[in-house]
Structure formats: structure tokens, C-alpha cells
Amino acid sequence: MKRPLIIVALAALAALLLPLVLPWGHAQIDWDHVRAGLMEHGHMLGTDDLGRDRLARLLVGTRTTMMVAFAAALVSLVIGTIWGAAAGWIGGRTDEIMMRIVDGLYALPFMFVVILLMVVFGRSILLVFIGIGAVEWLTMARVVRGQVMALKSRPFVLAAEAAGSPGRSTLIRHILPNVAGVAIAYLMLTVPQVVMVESFLSFLGLGVQEPLTSLGILVNEGADEMDMVPAALLLPGGILVTIIICLTLAGEKYRDHLAQQASR
């Protein structure tokens, strides 16, 4: 699990810090050197058809994609944990109604809902991660609900209730800490899914707006230039695939680690 996380951490650090020391901003235009080649005129990866530095845009695009992915995943964690914990703890008719709502939302075309939110409320980076996170919480809610229902009949929970602990306090102090490990595992698996969704939306032009950029936007732009500048597509595409694979591997290894601990 460490190696994939190290790769993602290094990519995140590079995307955060290197734009601060580059001589060109991601939206700054070098009118004198449009379509500059590699290592020409102070541009390590050259410039695009508008004279913008490719390296700066690649770093900022990576930063934007990762920021949206982690923020949206956190939104899904919060919503899913609250909903699932409430349903599992209350139980009965309330639990049935709440989970039927989740089942109904599962039946909706996920991508259509996100695109509809972008069209109705406009495009902004805030709305992107809220919109994606607001529809990615369904699996998290089911996972948390199952864990809460399994834990609330355990002896340490019954002992807390027998000692006079209020229901809300028992849930927060005794059950949720034991659910955290599983929730984090599924959070780590949610992040690469959000990366793919955000990149797809940006590829379609429904993600973040210029002058901000993301890996999806860069892949879209690179596809038009692939014949002349293959690196314009290969670099953002390679970074995107690497991030998705590393995050998926890390999440699966952490989930397997939890499963091994639970079986002991």
C-alpha cells in the first residue's frame, strides 16, 4: 500500500509546489512563442496553440483533478456516514424507508444527474465536487449501515447502553470509531472513481472553467494535437491513469488488510 500512496503523494507535492517556482503561470500567454517545442524559449514542455506553458498547465491540471477528487470523496464520506449510521442505528421502518430512498437513487443514471446539476447551476469547481460527492455517497451509506447494524448488538455496545449512555452518545463514541476503518477503505476506493468522473466531465466541457484547467481538459486538448505533439495527450493521460491505478491499488490493499484483521 505504501508505494502507490508515495507516488500519489509525490504527484500531489509536485502539483502544489512546482507552479510556485515556474517562470510562467498556467494561464499566462507567451505571444512571441506560440507552439514552442520542448525545451524552447524557457518552456520545458513547450507551449500550446495559445502560447500557454504546457508544464504549468499540466501541474495545475493535476492539482485541480486531485483537489476535486479528494474534496468530492470527503463530501460522499460525510453524507454517506451520516445517512448510513442513522439508518442502521434507528432500524425498523425508518431504516427501511431510508434505504429504499438509496435504492431509488441508485436506479437514476448517475452521469446524467451530474451533468444536469452542471447545466442547471452552472460550472464552478465548488459545484463540481459538491455535485459529484452528493451522488457518490450511496455505496458509503450502505457500507456504514451494515457495519452499524452488526456492531450495535455487540457486548461493548450493550454494556454502554446498560450503563445509561444515551443513544446518540453510544453511536458517536462507541460505534462510529469502529466503523472508521471500513469507511476509510471505501473512501480510498471512491477517490479514483471521482477522478474518472471529474476527468470525463472536464473532457466533455462540463467540468472546471478556464482559466483553470484539469487533466480531463488537457486530455481533450491533447487529442486534437496528438498528430503534431503526442506529448500533449500522452503526459496528462499517463498521469491520469497512474493516479487512478495507484489510488485503486492502495484502497484495495487497505481493504484486504482490514479483512485479514477482522478474520483473526
What does each model-found stretch correspond to?
Residues 18-21, 68-103, 115:
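Transmembrane-helix boundary motif in ABC transporter permease subunits
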Residues 1-28, 101, 179-180:
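N-terminal signal-anchor/first transmembrane alpha helix
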Residues 64-80, 107-115, 177, 181-198, ...:
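Hydrophobic alpha-helical transmembrane segments in multi-pass membrane proteins
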Residues 27-73, 218-237:
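Periplasmic/extracellular loop-to-transmembrane helix junction in inner-membrane transport proteins
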Residues 44, 48, 54, 88-89, ...:
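Generic hydrophobic transmembrane alpha-helix motif, especially the helices
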Residues 135, 181, 185-191, 230-264:
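C-terminal transmembrane helix and the adjacent membrane-cytosol boundary/short C-terminal tail
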Residues 115-116, 124-129, 133, 183-217:
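Non-cytoplasmic
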